[in-house]
Swiss-Prot record:
GO biological process: acetyl-CoA biosynthetic process from acetate
Domain of life: Bacteria
Residue ranges that the Swiss-Prot or TrEMBL entry lists as coiled coil: none
PROSITE patterns associated with the record: AMP_BINDING
A cellular component term, taken from the record's GO annotations: cytosol
Keywords linked to the UniProt accession: Acetylation, ATP-binding, Ligase, Magnesium, Metal-binding, Nucleotide-binding
Gene that produces this protein: acsA
Post-translational changes noted in the entry: Acetylated. Deacetylation by the SIR2-homolog deacetylase activates the enzyme.
Cofactor names: Mg(2+)
Family to which the UniProt record says this protein belongs: Belongs to the ATP-dependent AMP-binding enzyme family.
A Pfam family of this chain: ACAS_N
The name this protein goes by in its record: Acetyl-coenzyme A synthetase
Signal peptide interval: none
C-alpha cells in the first residue's frame, strides 16, 4: 500500500492489534464518532472512568468566558493521590520509578516508597511555609527527587514550575521573577559525560538581584561538589527530609486549580508561563498513556526526556504513575560512556515501551548505526518519537534496527500548551507513514484550515488548529490574559469563533493523514527545544558590533534544525567577513550566558540590511528560504526595500556555496 509520495504504509502486526486497547481503525472511528455526536458525554464518561474523584463534578465544560475554558467544575481531586495513593491496594510493592545515574548508581522506588517520600517532601515544604497556590521553582537534574518534589507540590496544592537545568542564571531569574516563586528547589549539581556539573551556582547568580519573592532555597546533594551556602536562606534537603513524617493528607483541589506552570518560548522575547489545571491535565495524561503507548500493568516504560520540558512532566512523571506503570528515569546523555548505553538499558530493564526524540535517534544512528545489534531489544513493543518531525530515513532505522520491524512507531505531535498528545498513530490501529503524525486522537478536533476556517484540500499548506477545546489545554499565560488570546486565539476562526492555532503549518495527504511542516511563527525548534527568535536576537544585540539581527532555522542532520544568524553591523564596527568566525564565537558565548547552551548559532552572514515590511516587521520566512538555499517564492514586492533580498542572496551564495 503506497501513499501519494510513494512511501510505504506500515500496518500494525495482527498479533499486536489483537491485544491492543484500540485494535483497529473501526474502533478508533467509533470513539471519534462518539466525541462528535456527544462531545460532553464523551468527556464525562472518560473523566468518571479514569479519575478517582473526592467529589464528582457537576458541569463538564464551561465555555461562558471562552477561550478561558473550564472543565469538570464542581469536582475535587488530588493529582498526587491519583498517581500514588489509589495504587496502594493493588500495586504498593510494584516498582513505580527506576532510576539509573550516569555514574552507574541505581535505585528502585516502589509505589509505597514513592508515596512515603512524596509525603515527607510535602511535609518539609509545608514546614518552609509553602501552602496552596504558592509557586515553587524546581531547577534540578534528572534524579528521583525531582519527581518527588513535583508530586509533593501537587499533594499540598503548591504550583510547581520546573526550569530546565541547562538554562542560564539569567533565564532562570526571568522565570523566578515572573512566577513570583516563594521557594527554589535545586541540587548542588549532577553528572554529565562522566564529570560533575553544577546547578547551585546558577541559582546563586539568579537570586543575586530582583528575586525578592524567594524566601528559601532547598538543596538536594547529588554530586557532593563544594558549594556556597547563604545562612538563613539555603538548607540541605537530604538532611531535613529524613526527619519528616511519611504521612501527609492530600489537599482537596478543585478541578481547575493550577497544577503547574511551565515556561515556553514566545515570539516576543519574554517566555510565557503556560498554566495547566489539575483534572483535565491528569485525565489526558492517563488517557494518552493508555491509548498511544497501549500501556499495560506489566510494562517497563521509558521516556528519555528531561523533566524540565513538558514531555518529562506528562510522560516521565504524571502519565506513567497515573496508570500504575513502571517509569524509568535516567541521568546523562545517549552516548556516554558509549553509544550502547541506551540499548544496554533497554535489555537490562526489559523496556517494552520506549519514547525519545528524533535528535537522539539521528545522533545514535550517525554515531554507531550497528551498535543496537549487540543487544537483545526483543522486549520492545512500542516505540515513540517526540519534539519535532522525524525524517523518514531516521524513522526507518528506528523501525528496523531498534524495533526489529515489529514495534510500531507512534510519531507524536503535541505541545507544551496541549498538555499531551494530539495527533499520533495508535499502535494497534493506525497504518504508519514514516515522518507523518497521521490522525488526531478521539476527542481532539485538529484540522488544517485557512484563517477563515475553511478546510484545506489534499496537499495544500494550511494552519494547524484545534477547533474545539480539550481538557488538558493551556488555561492561560501566567499574569497575561491578553497575551494568551493574542498568542493562541487571534490567527484563525471557524464558524465565526476563534480557535486555537498551534503556530505550526501542516497539510493533508490522500489518506487524510496530517503532516507537520514546521513553525509558521518566529520560534525555532532546535533538537526538540523551542526557542523564541526574539529572545536570541535580544541577546545577540548585546554584542557591540551588532546593530540588528534576524535568526532563522536551517536543516541539521542531527538536531533537525540549527540556528542561522543574519547580522547587520553597527556603523562603528570594525568587524568584517574575515572576523566572522571570531564574532560567531563571541555571539555564542553571549547566548550561553543569556539563554543556555541549547541556543548556539551554527552559521552567520553579515548583511547591509534585513528584508522588512513597510510596518517594520522582519520577514523571517524569506530569510529562512535564503538560509536553506531554497528558491524564493514569497512575494517580495511589498517589502520596504526589495533590493536587499537580492543582495543577501548574492552574499549567501558567495559565502556558503
Amino acid at each position: 500500500m503506497l501513499n501519494q509520495n510513494n512511501q510505504e504504509l506500515f500496518k500494525p502486526s495482527k498479533e499486536f492489534s489483537r491485544n491492543a486497547r484500540i485494535k483497529n481503525l473501526c474502533e478508533y472511528y467509533d470513539l471519534c464518532d462518539e466525541a462528535k455526536e456527544d462531545f460532553e458525554g464523551f468527556w464525562k464518561r472518560q473523566a468518571f472512568e479514569k479519575i478517582e474523584w473526592f467529589s464528582p463534578f457537576s458541569r463538564v465544560l464551561n465555555e461562558d468566558k471562552a477561550p478561558f475554558y473550564k472543565w469538570f467544575e464542581g469536582g475535587t481531586l488530588n493529582v498526587s493521590y491519583q498517581c500514588l495513593d489509589r495504587h496502594m491496594k493493588t500495586r504498593r510493592n510494584k516498582a513505580a520509578l527506576i532510576f539509573e545515574g550516569e555514574m552507574g548508581d541505581y535505585e528502585v522506588y516502589t509505589y509505597r516508597r514513592l508515596l512515603h517520600e512524596t509525603c515527607k517532601a510535602a511535609n518539609l515544604l509545608k514546614k518552609f511555609g509553602v501552602k496552596k497556590g504558592d509557586r515553587v521553582v524546581i531547577y534540578m537534574p534528572m534524579i528521583p527527587e525531582t519527581a518527588i518534589v513535583m508530586l509533593a507540590c501537587a499533594r499540598i496544592g503548591a504550583i510547581h514550575s520546573v526550569v530546565f537545568g541547562g538554562f542560564s542564571p539569567e533565564a532562570l531569574r526571568d522565570r523566578i521573577i515572573d512566577a513570583g516563586a516563594k521557594l527554589v528547589v535545586t541540587a548542588d549539581g549532577a553528572f554529565r559525560r562522566g564529570k560533575p556539573y553544577m546547578l547551585k551556582p546558577a541559582v546563586d547568580k539568579a537570586l543575586s538581584e530582583g528575586c525578592e519573592s524567594v524566601e528559601k532555597v532547598l538543596i538536594v546533594i547529588r554530586n557532593n561538589e563544594p558549594i556556597e551556602y547563604i545562612k538563613g536562606r539555603d538548607y540541605v534537603y537530604n538532611e531535613l527530609v529524613k526527619n519528616e513524617s511519611y504521612k501527609c493528607e492530600p489537599e482537596i483541589m478543585d478541578s481547575e486549580d493550577l497544577l503547574f506552570l511551565l515556561y515556553t518560548s514566545g515570539s516576543t522575547g519574554k517566555p510565557k508561563g503556560v498554566m495547566h489545571a489539575s483534572a483535565g491535565y491528569i485525565l489526558w495524561a492517563q488517557m494518552t498513556m493508555e491509548w498511544v503507548f497501549d500501556i499495560k500493568d506489566y510494562d517497563n516504560y521509558w521516556c528519555s526526556a528531561d523533566v524540565g520540558w513538558i514531555t518529562g512532566h506528562t510522560y516521565v512523571v504524571y502519565g506513567p504513575l497515573a496508570c500504575g506503570a513502571t517509569t524509568i528515569m535516567h541521568e546523562g546523555t545517549p552516548t556516554y560512556p558509549n553509544s550502547g548505553r541506551w540499548w544496554r538499558m533497554i535489555e537490562e530493564y526489559q523496556i517494552s515501551k520506549f519514547y525519545t526524540s528524533p535528535t537522539a535517534i539521528r545522533m545514535l544512528h550517525a554515531d554507531a548505526p550497528n551498535e543496537p545489534r549487540k543487544y537483545d531489544l526483543s522486549t520492545l513493543e512500542v516505540l515513540g518519537t517526540v519534539g519535532e518531525p522525524i525524517n523518514p530515513s531516521a524513522w526507518k532505522w528506528f523501525y528496523d534496527e531498534i524495533g526489529g520491524t515489529k514495534s510500531p512507531i507512534v510519531d507524536t505531535w503535541w505541545q507544551t500548551e496541549t498538555g499531551g498528545h494530539m495527533i499520533t498513530p495508535l499502535p494497534g490501529a493506525t497504518p504508519l507513514k514514516p515522518g507523518c503524525a497521521t490522525l488526531p486522537l478521539p476527542g481532539i478536533f485538529a484540522e488544517v484550515i485557512d484563517e477563515e476556517g475553511n478546510k484545506k484540500d489534499e496537499g495544500e499548506d494550511g494552519l494547524l488548529c484545534i477547533t474545539k477545546p480539550w481538557p488538558s489545554m493551556i488555561r492561560g499565560i501566567w499574569g497575561n490574559d491578553e497575551r494568551y488570546i493574542e498568542s493562541y486565539f487571534s490567527q484563525a476562526k471557524k464558524d465565526g469563533k476563534a480557535v486555537y492555532f498551534s503556530g505550526d503549518g501542516a497539510f493533508y495527504d490522500k489518506n487524510g493523514y496530517i503532516t507537520i511542516t514546521g513553525r509558521t511563527d518566529d520560534v525555532v525548534n532546535v533538537a526538540g527545544h523551542r526557542i523564541g527568535t526574539a529572545e536570541i536576537e535580544s541577546a545577540i544585540a548585546k554584542h557591540p558590533s551588532v546593530a540588528e539581527s534576524a535568526v532563522v532555522s536551517i536543516l541539521d542532520t542531527i538536531k533537525g534544525e540549527s540556528l542561522f544568524a543574519f547580522v547587520v553591523l553597527s556603523p562603528a564596527s570594525s568587524c568584517d567577513l574575515g572576523g566572522a568566525i571570531e564574532t560567531l564565537k563571541e555571539l555564542n558565548d553571549i547566548l550561553r550566558v543569556e539563554i543556555g547552551p541549547i541556543a548556539k548559532i551554527e552559521k552567520i552572514l553579515y548583511t547591509p540590511g534585513l528584508p522588512k515590511t513597510r510596518s517594520g516587521k522582519i520577514m523571517r520566512r524569506i530569510l529562512r528560504t535564503i538560509a536553506r538555499g531554497e528558491e524564493i517564492k514569497q512575494d517580495i514586492s511589498t517589502l520596504e526595500d526589495s533590493k536587499v533580498v537580492e543582495t543577501i542572496v548574492k552574499l549567501a551564495k558567495a559565502e556558503f556555496e
